[in-house]
Amino acid sequence: MKNRIFLAGATGAIGRRLLPLLLNAGYEVTGMTRSQAKALEFRGRGMRIVVADVFDADAVMRALRDARPDIVIHQLTDLSALAGSASPTAAISRNARIRSEGTRNLVNAARAVGAQRMIAQSISWAYGPGPLPHVESDPLDVHAGEPRSITVGGINALENAVLNSPPLLGTILRYGQLYGPGTGVDAPRGAAPLHVDAAAYAALLAVQHEAHGIYDIAELDADVVTEKARCELEWRDNMRLPEDAVTHIAV
């Protein structure tokens, strides 16, 4: 019997690409979104969808109790706020709050309902100063000045919560800078680029390989070493989904 999976952020850029991968692999999936309108897209698509705000701890607890997942996948961010905000610092702060308070609510609920594992999205550009390329054991830039400190603080809180909440086994996927459908960026740019399909693929592989710990996930680049993901997860950065696989889930 395949594991039951609870996907927080099911209608986000990565979530939409991850859903067909999970469903085609035979997993029983419950997706969470805060948007009622987006939830309506998923009716009759082979999965359950629940509407809940990650900042509402009671709502998150109810959603996970109903789903009874074996694995929780945390793909929540607020990329739309970062892209369209007139106040970048406010948008960064909201994203950091998702990573700190939102993650805490998910972890608490996952432990309460007996989930065995949590796989969470992080970023690969939060490392502190030091020689390149970075590896997973390098420290985060916890002494950065603002506004970078807001982002790194959120990442630090997320990773600590996911990795240090026994008996929950935690996996951190430190994604590079996303591009591709739904990200608002068409082509690779910046340090450690990553196509959104390859990001989703890494999450699927983390489920299948029962991986735990930290993995850098990015295209071959001078900034981070991704050998661990390529060897342990058999991940590859050139994985791409056929578009009809995605439109079958959400049009």
Roles of regions detected by a PLM:
Residues A8, M32, Q75-D78, M118-S124, ...:
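SDR active-site strand-loop-helix element
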Residues L178-G182, G190-Y215, E219-L220, C231:
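Alpha-helical substrate-binding/gating segment
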Residues A52, A57, Q208, D223-V251:
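C-terminal amphipathic/interface module of NAD(P)-dependent oxidoreductases
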Residues A126-P131, H143, L168-R189:
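Flexible, glycine-rich beta-alpha linker
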Residues Q36-E101:
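NAD(P)H-binding glycine-rich loop region in Rossmannoid oxidoreductase-like domains
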Residues N3-E28:
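N-terminal Rossmann NAD(P)H-binding glycine-rich loop of SDR-like oxidoreductase domains
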Residues H143-G170:
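Active-site Tyr-X1-5-Lys
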Residues A83-E146:
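Conserved Rossmann-fold NAD(P)-dependent oxidoreductase catalytic core, especially the SDR/UDP-sugar
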